[in-house]
């Protein structure tokens, strides 16, 4: 084999840095606002961060740009390799649940990138949230690479690398106010059109219900009583509905008591059901919930939401026709 052929036969290696440019910041902004949701990807493969040697650590990431960028930005001044799996542009935690951040893809990516020819060691550092999708035993059996799970948050990696031991605090998955605030734009975009229509036609109650479910709920999440997201949503929705119900009851003192009570009841039925449904959507955005728990919650509470919403709508129409 000639030197030229050997050159082209080397494992493919992409270069990256730990800093962001304007294009990266724009990508982050668009991703947060759900613009081109399928387009926030990096090419799967092996990346060199800084000037790694064959003894440098190997980290594993999803090919969702926010996941990849969170990892590389946390590795300032740490020469290393990043093995990017093809998770179809989905973050680590969600991809682990769907199976794309999984054993087969990890094994395949090790083989395709010929990682064993790039590094002298046989250690991989995976994100903790990727653990549900990967069998470390199976990966070692098929590739001879040992799987090691790093801390829950990429920002703790520099400290973790000193001992390769995660403290209890590093293992704890947090869902801080800032984490919750970053979820609001993408949730808000999905309801922007109905929200605008409701405001234009003057239906302030349902509009408030949507804002409560998409904006207030993630902010107030830790302080709303109960464990289930649905019941939290019902509680928040009832609190939002109460002023509307009181205003409806007091609006026309000359009307019959049953009419005023019915109008108040409309708000107490519609708003909590809408807010609870939107709150339930947040179960997919936090590690506080499990797949089985979410399924139980859906079966338990979605029928209640539907009945409340239907009853509120029917009552609203009925009052109009009776009057």
What are these model-derived regions, one by one?
Residues 163-180, 287-296:
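Non-transmembrane, extramembrane segments of multi-pass ion/lipid transporters
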Residues 41-46, 170-187:
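Cytosolic juxtamembrane amphipathic/interface segments immediately preceding
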Residues 218, 234-323:
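Generic detector of multi-pass transmembrane helix bundles and their immediately adjacent loops
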Residues 139-172:
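Extended, hydrophilic extramembrane loops/domains of integral membrane proteins
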Residues 1-151:
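Soluble N-terminal domains of membrane-associated systems
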Residues 181-253:
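Core alpha-helical transmembrane segments of integral membrane proteins
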Residues 2-7, 28-29, 156-160, 169, ...:
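Catalytic or ion-coupling anion/metal-binding cores of large enzyme and transporter domains
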């Amino acid at each position: 084999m000639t030197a030229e052929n050997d050159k082209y036969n080397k494992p493919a290696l992409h270069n990256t840095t730990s800093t962001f440019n304007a294009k990266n910041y724009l990508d982050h902004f668009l991703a947060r606002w759900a613009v081109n949701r399928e387009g926030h990807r990096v090419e799967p493969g092996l990346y060199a961060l800084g000037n790694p040697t064959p003894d440098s650590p190997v980290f594993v990431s999803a090919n969702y740009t926010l996941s990849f960028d969170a990892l590389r930005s946390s590795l300032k001044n740490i020469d290393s390799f990043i093995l990017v799996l093809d998770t179809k542009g989905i973050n680590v935690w969600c991809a682990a649940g769907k199976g794309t951040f999984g054993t087969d893809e990890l094994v395949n990516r090790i083989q395709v990138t010929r990682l064993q020819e790039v590094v002298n060691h046989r250690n991989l550092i995976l994100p903790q949230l990727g653990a549900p999708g990967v069998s470390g035993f199976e990966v070692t059996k098929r590739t001879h690479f040992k799987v090691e799970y790093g801390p829950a948050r990429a920002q703790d990696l520099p400290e973790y690398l000193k001992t390769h031991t995660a403290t209890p605090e590093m293992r704890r998955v947090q869902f801080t106010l800032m984490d919750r605030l970053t979820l609001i734009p993408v949730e808000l975009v999905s309801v922007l059109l109905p929200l605008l229509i409701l405001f234009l036609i003057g239906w302030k109650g349902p509009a408030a219900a949507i804002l409560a479910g998409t904006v207030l709920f993630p902010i107030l999440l830790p302080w709303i009583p109960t464990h289930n997201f649905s019941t939290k949503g019902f509680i928040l929705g009832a609190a939002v509905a109460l002023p509307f119900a009181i205003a409806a009851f007091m609006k026309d003192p000359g009307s019959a008591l049953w009419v005023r009570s019915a109008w108040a009841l409309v708000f107490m039925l519609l708003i909590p059901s809408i807010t609870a449904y939107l709150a339930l959507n947040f179960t997919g955005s936090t590690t506080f919930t499990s797949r089985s728990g979410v399924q139980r919650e859906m079966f338990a509470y979605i029928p209640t939401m539907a009945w409340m919403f239907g009853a509120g709508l029917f009552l609203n129409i009925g009052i109009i026709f009776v009057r």
